Amino acid sequence: MKNKATPIDIETLVDESLLVFIASDDVQDTLQGVRRGIEREMLRVTPSAQLSHRPHPKSLGSALTHPYITTDFSEAQLELVTPAVTGRKETFKKLASLHHFVATHLPEGESMWAASMPPSLPLDSDIAIANYGTSNVGMAKMRYREGLANRYGKRMQLISGIHYNFSLPKPFWQMLHANTESQLPLEDFISERYFHLIRNVLRNGWIIPYLFGASPAADKSYLRDKPYQLLQLDSTTDYLPWATSLRLSNLGYGSSEQSRFPISFNSKQDYLIGLCKALTQPSVQYSYLAEHQQLNGSVLQLENELYGSIRPKIVNAQMRPLVAMCHYGVEYIELRSLDNNPLLPLGIDELQSQFIDLFLLYSALSPSPEISKQERTLIMQRQELVATQGRKPNLMLPTLNGEVLLTDLAKPLMNLLAKMATIMDGGQNTNGYEKAVMREQAKFDTSQLTPSAQILSVMEQENLNFTTLMKSYSDEHQQGYLSDTLSDDEMTQLQMLAYNSLLEQKQLEAGNEENFDEYLAQKRHINCEMPSRADAALSMQRYSMQFQDNKEPANQL
């Protein structure tokens, strides 16, 4: 682990010393404590594959206060959230249970849209922003979404995906801390190592859209009035023949204004300085908007507005993330670059989860130099090339060493992941990791096995447009959700959560102690220079009382 790596060789580096570290029985024991959680966004659609105009069903509870079933940008955009637990099977069982519960409580005829790219969309004026009621916290969430709509348009916000939350246990970090002979205090070491992980994910993150991208096509209504040159499969479907993920491309989720303020992941300090600047710097593009049209006129209204494929995260309901991370560090990462795979009932499966865990563990252990401006540009270029042309034969990707064949760039990483998989399976008496790597390696050997290729193949062979095929998958999965069963205890628990969340929202609405303008004025205040943890807790005490939201981080808007 003490080998030095220079930026010039990082993209092809194979560091065998990490294999020695993870092969230890003690380290294998700690890895049983890896926690993961999944958040899946999906649109509610009508039998004719139109965006639902109905409100979020009350039978699902309050979108404001329910811990597992909420909404994202739109009233018709569900978000299902599993708690972070150590058991992978438990995570997927919970995710399946949430799908079943939602399916049984949707308005008649509605289903959950299986794809990341939305179906045929109405005009922006006919897309309803999520409604969170009349409490101050609820109205703030709605004002934030008004800001998103006015800044980026509503259609972009309706792109859905999967967020994968991942944390390594403290005993693992303690062993790595000793192994690397780090002079940093343990808590600082953990935070910096999460940024270390993030940098490696950024470097090698192009493999995510290649392997798991599932949005090579979109309904024509999404690109209405946008100057992008896509091919037409038919009069309703735009696509790119070699694309893996339009969602992750420049025509998907992104912000030109944010690109003017690139935030560094070279250290916790660099990240927080950049984030604070974006939260306090008046935006050239958005300052003209009226107060009621957004939370504020900064480049970022809130931390959550920061777009990117991966984020450092901390859960602390007592203070906003900027301050909490400043004083308590990073607790976990959120991988945000996963498309909903419409070929899978849950949009993701356990083998994919095992591969992602391996990739993230590799990223935490492999050398990770700072990312220069030059390398950051190359990372963005690789991402765009793979998102729009990833399956193109003999595609060359730019690196610090010049252009490299995509499959050649993948080889050292996949070889090392295969070795890690053997060690992990041996230590945990399974064979899932090796199966996961073999399945993904096959996609590099044969690009037709990627989900993006499979989707386009079905469209072309069966002469189906995007919306028709995705509606077919959605209906098929809906029948599967309905045929699943929950135990009486599970169903009762979910029904009680829904009921209690509605009560909690009413209590919040009855407890407004100040007018909304005063509430927002407090929310706009950011102190980026709090000198101590005690001062941070004291300064944020009032903030905490105002913004606690569903026992989640106060800023989860």
Predicted feature descriptions by range:
Residues G37, K93, S97, M139, ...:
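Generic recognition of stable, solvent-exposed alpha-helical segments in well-folded globular domains
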Residues H53-H56, F92, S125-D126, L176-H177, ...:
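Short conserved micro-motifs at the rims of enzyme active sites and ligand-binding pockets
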Residues P118-S120, A218-Y222, R376-V386, Y433-K443:
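A glycine-rich phosphate-binding loop feature that marks nucleotide/adenosyl-phosphate handling sites
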Residues C326-Y328, I333-A421:
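Substrate-recognition/cap regions that form aromatic- and gly/pro-loop-enriched pockets
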